[in-house]
Design a protein with these regions (language model features):
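Bacterial N-terminal signal peptides
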Residues: 7-18, 22
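Histidine-rich, glycine-flanked metal-binding segment
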Residues: 25-37, 46, 50-92, 102, ...
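Divalent metal-coordination and catalytic microenvironments
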Residues: 44, 64, 86, 97, ...
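C-terminal cap of metal-dependent C-N hydrolases
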Residues: 44, 407, 419-462, 537, ...
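Short, solvent-exposed loop/turn and secondary-structure capping segments
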Residues: 71, 93, 103-108, 186-189, ...
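His/Asp/Glu-enriched, well-ordered alpha-helical/loop segment
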Residues: 132, 274, 320-430, 518, ...
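Polyanionic/metal-chelating signatures
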Residues: 156-299, 303-308, 440, 446, ...
């Protein structure tokens, strides 16, 4: 009996010892004793949360947790007491988007055979292997940059210097994010102590991460990137269904493949895991919101720094924003003329940048701050001070460092505020508080362990101040003058503190005041009357009424109400325009445009990219829209490029300058897609490295079309069988979905084409599949096969007078448009150029010059005919009752060489007025001159240097994604117009 009791006692003792944990273990001889686990920080100002502060308060920590916080708390007898009467204590700061490069997974050198079956996804014959971009070895997704199964927690091994730098800024924890790819993998939330990784990881899989950026192989465009994300989530949904079906009946069906990438997306699909999207630009931020809602995701967004451009769109995103504080700084330029090449947009970005965080909070959005994108983290507090000076309130800033990131990272029950039971992470600041520029972070506490960030000066450091002055070891002259006293000691020269204080005050005052205006201030409709009467004009209706002299047009509620010779009954709010001596015409339509496309016109990696969508990357911010309005253009067909036989889906827009991407889109338009023939698609001039992708010959192109149409038909058959029999649905394939719409007649083909023989072969392939081609684009040899084109029912959207600019257009002639028109082909003229799109009316006039097309018919080449080709003539293209009131007012005939577009209206709203355009240019020129003056003054006060100066000045010269492809003339408008105002 006694033996049994003894065993029970021993067992109890062992259990008790084990329950004490590592902190109570007796260390072996020679180890430094562990510090006490109980601490009392006494006499500090303590922020329990961003809006509640206690003075002369005490915070008690025990065994890594907060035990108590409040006034008049006695320090426990077993506590080490830390006097903190000159300190402010905050909940430990949290970086919600922490980049540490050492977490990148290794690159794989394994390869796989890219040839797959007929209905393959991206594995077309001869395309560049994804393996060169693969970072996750082993099983995974077909696109190498999709690695949701990558886990930061697996490879977390931060450099000690990185942790130290973050602690010096007051950060105690952070969410470490993966750094590469599109769907990048899961982040890990960690404490920023020096303890082993196993001890500091608080959440192993915090978020899933997506970056909207292009890659070395497919996808190489932003629209391709979005297509990859869309397809990956569709595949994940199918994968979940397929795996569940197999688990239910493993002996009755074929085993599905295991895919760790798709498996890792399951928690995202059921909203158990939040997705953090890094879009890279303001419009991609807008697209991130649309994409996340389309996919049904819980999401947050990493700010690009350009949200100031469209706060209205950011408000509609309606998600938390993680905001980096990487701000551009004004440089000192070596020559005064160098400022001529600095655009207004670059100056605006510099002046707005510090206000970005405050602006997002003003939209009612949650904001967390991060050190992400800073090449030198030391500038974080300086940039935070600038953000505070520009409207970010201190409680909001404190929330952005504590409660908001804690909530966003799912750790608010353990971090973010100072209250009993939470992890003992604290940030201790000397002086009046963290947001004072001169205050120092004294120490941080992580898991109840103190880390000194301002160590006391060592005796050796003191002695160094009294050593003899010596030249720098490099032999260069010291930048700081040495003054030697009688004792032979080096003495630091005195600085005139009053001068320094004056300069600092002047700089602060300059930086607080924003000079830059919002881009939207000079955009949008100039007039929005309920009704408009244009009277006594020569009206080119482009409809059955033809050309009317001294006629009237009445517009009501954005629609054409009456056209002709009538006595109008006007309401009191009708705007009357006397157009005596002027010409009124429908708004011009460009049937082939690449004007407003973000992140690449081509997804040229694969021979078929029917899954990519121009609608995902419409650029509403480009100044090209304003310039084209000045030429009378009101509608454009935005097309994918011609790098592959089957390109991406088109998007038809109205030039409602000032609206966002969704506001530009003409939603009544039928869906369309770009196809292409000729040299481009067979990679004739792509260089010796691009000679393997099928097709490589002209005869291979029709074969490829037959292959993809057949694949689409098989895909449709598979879905039809599923609807009859049930079971697991087929995998959604967005390429074949789009091609199936062509077979169904609900998506129109717009095909880049030059040679007559290729055009004929293409039409025959389409006819075998009962597909009618909507337009043959460029169609320079269309005059050779005009009868066949007319019989098929295709339109011809031509270049006017382009010929002999490459071998396959050697037989092009400027009479092609008129010749095809005479043979019954519906002909339009297009630009294929943002510059040419500003003068489509002169392109129409070439139809008169080359081929003697009657003037009213020639004008239809850029109005009614392209509307018919695009399937939108029910709404636009002519001035007829019931159609949209899209019209232009001209000084002379719209086909005259000396005509000037005076006004452009869309849906009864005036978007361009020549008189306003001159005022606008003057206003923008003055704004630019004022910004240059401010930048020069700031640069002179800062010396153009300091911590992080090189990176910040590089950022100053970067151009926004939305502005990368502006015409040179746009830069003239922004940089050189009215230079005397400088």
């Amino acid at each position: 009996m006694s033996i049994v009791v003894l065993r029970l006692v021993c067992a109890a003792s062992l259990f008790a010892a084990a329950s004490l944990g590592r902190a109570a273990e007796l260390l072996s001889a020679g180890h430094r004793p562990k510090p006490p686990g109980v601490h009392a920080l006494v006499g500090a100002k303590v922020f329990l949360n961003p809006t509640t502060a206690l003075t002369n308060a005490t915070v008690i920590l025990r065994d890594g947790l907060i035990e108590a916080a409040g006034r008049d708390l006695p320090a426990p007898a077993d506590a080490r007491v830390w006097p903190a009467s000159n300190s402010v204590i905050y909940a430990g700061f949290i970086d919600a988007y922490l980049s540490i490069a050492s977490t990148n997974p290794p690159v794989s050198t394994m390869h796989f055979d890219p040839v797959d079956g007929l209905t393959s996804g991206i594995n077309f014959l001869g395309v560049e292997s994804q393996e060169k971009a693969r970072t996750q070895p082993g099983a995974g997704y077909e696109v190498a940059s999709v690695t949701p199964h990558a886990r930061v927690a697996r490879d977390y091994a931060p450099p000690a210097k990185t942790l130290e730098a973050l602690r010096e800024l007051g950060f105690t924890a952070g969410n470490v994010v993966p750094a590469h790819g599109i769907i990048r993998g899961s982040s890990a939330f960690v404490n920023l102590s020096d303890a082993p990784p196993n001890e500091v990881i608080l959440r192993a899989d915090t978020h899933q991460h997506i970056a909207l950026e292009s890659q070395e192989v497919y996808p190489k465009s932003l629209m391709g990137t979005i297509a990859v994300v869309r397809q990956a989530f569709a595949d994940a949904r199918h994968y979940v269904l397929d795996q569940a079906d197999y688990r239910a009946k493993p002996t009755a069906r074929k085993r599905p493949e295991f895919n760790p990438a798709l498996d890792a997306l399951a928690p995202v699909l059921n909203k158990a895991t939040t997705v953090v999207i890094e879009p890279g630009s303001v419009l991609m931020g807008d697209r991130a919101g649309h994409l996340a809602r389309e996919l049904g995701l819980n999401f947050a967004v990493v700010a690009s720094g350009h949200e100031w451009r469209r706060p209205d769109l950011m408000k509609a995103v309606d998600a938390p924003f993680i905001v980096p504080l990487n701000l551009p700084s004004a440089p000192k330029l070596p020559d005064e003329d160098d400022w001529l090449d600095v655009s207004l947009d670059q100056l605006r970005q510099w002046d707005w940048a510090a206000e970005n965080a405050a602006l997002l909070r003003a939209q009612g959005l949650e904001v967390a701050l991060t050190t992400h994108a800073l090449t030198d983290r030391k500038v974080f507090r300086k940039n935070l001070r600038l953000a505070l000076d520009r409207g970010l309130a201190e409680p909001g800033a404190l929330a952005a460092l504590t409660t908001v990131p804690a909530k966003l990272c799912g750790i608010a029950d353990r971090l973010g505020t100072i209250e009993p039971g939470k992890i003992a992470n604290l940030t201790v600041v000397e002086g009046v508080g963290y947001f004072d520029a001169d205050a120092k972070v004294r120490q941080v506490w992580i898991d109840g362990v103190p880390f000194e960030t301002q160590p006391a000066r060592k005796p050796a450091d003191v002695r160094q101040l009294t050593t003899k002055a010596e030249p720098p070891p490099t032999g260069k002259k010291s930048e700081t003058p040495n003054v030697v006293s009688n004792g032979g000691k080096a003495v630091t020269p005195k600085v005139d503190k009053s001068v320094a204080a004056t300069k600092k005050a002047e700089l602060t005052a300059l930086q607080k005041q924003r000079v830059a205006q919002s881009p939207n201030a000079s955009r949008g409709a100039l007039l929005t009357p309920r009704s408009v009467l244009i009277q006594n004009a020569t009206v080119w209706t482009c409809g059955p009424q033809g050309v009317l002299t001294n006629a009237n047009v009445l517009v009501v509620s954005g629609k054409v109400h009456q056209v002709g010779f009538f006595k109008p009954q006007l309401s009191s709010d009708t705007l009357v325009i006397d157009a005596t001596g002027k010409h009124l015409a429908p708004g011009l339509i460009d049937c082939h445009s690449h004007t407003a496309i973000l992140g690449g016109v081509n997804e040229g990696t694969l021979p078929s990219t029917a899954m990519v969508r121009i609608a995902d990357v419409v650029n509403s911010e480009t100044e090209n829209l304003f310039q084209q309005l000045a030429g009378g253009l009101t509608m454009a067909n935005l097309l994918h490029g011609s790098a592959n036989p089957i390109g991406g889906q088109n998007s038809i827009i109205k030039l409602r300058f000032g609206a966002g991407p969704e506001g530009l889109k003409f939603t009544n338009a039928p869906a369309g897609i770009k196809f292409a023939l000729g040299e481009n698609v067979k990679q004739s001039n792509w260089g010796d490295r691009n000679t393997t992708r099928f097709p490589q010959t002209r005869m291979g192109v029709p074969t490829f079309f037959e292959n993809r149409f057949t694949a689409a038909r098989q895909y449709q058959n598979a879905w039809a069988e599923y609807r009859r029999k049930g079971g697991v649905p087929p995998r959604t394939n967005f390429e074949l979905e789009a091609l199936g719409e062509i077979l169904n007649g609900t998506r129109l083909i717009h095909c880049h084409s030059y040679r007559g023989d290729e055009i004929l072969a293409f039409l025959r392939v389409c006819e075998r599949f009962s597909v009618r081609v909507a337009t043959l684009q460029h169609v320079l040899e269309g005059y050779k096969v005009a009868d066949e084109i007319a019989k098929h029912g295709a339109g011809g959207s031509c270049f006017t007078d382009w010929w002999a600019y490459k071998f396959e257009v050697w037989d092009a002639i400027p009479y092609a448009g008129s010749l095809m028109h005479a043979r019954g082909v519906n002909v339009s003229f297009n630009s294929d150029s943002s510059e040419l799109a500003r003068r489509m009316y002169l392109e129409a006039a070439k139809g008169v010059k080359y081929g003697a097309t009657p003037e009213p018919e020639a004008l239809k080449f850029v109005t009614l005919n392209p509307a018919k080709q695009l399937g939108v003539d029910k709404w636009v293209g002519s001035l007829e009752p019931g159609k949209d009131a899209d019209f232009t007012l001209w000084s002379h005939s719209p086909l005259a060489y000396n005509t000037v577009c005076e006004q452009t209206w869309i849906e009864g709203r005036k978007y361009f007025d020549r008189a306003f355009a001159a005022q606008r240019a003057e206003t923008l020129a003055k704004e630019r001159a004022d910004l240059i003056a401010k930048a020069k003054k700031v640069a002179s006060l800062t010396g153009g240097g300091g911590e992080g100066a090189a990176a910040a000045q590089t950022l100053f010269f970067q151009r926004a994604l939305e502005k990368l492809h502006e015409l040179g003339i746009a830069e003239c408008l922004e940089c050189r117009l009215n230079q005397k105002s400088q």
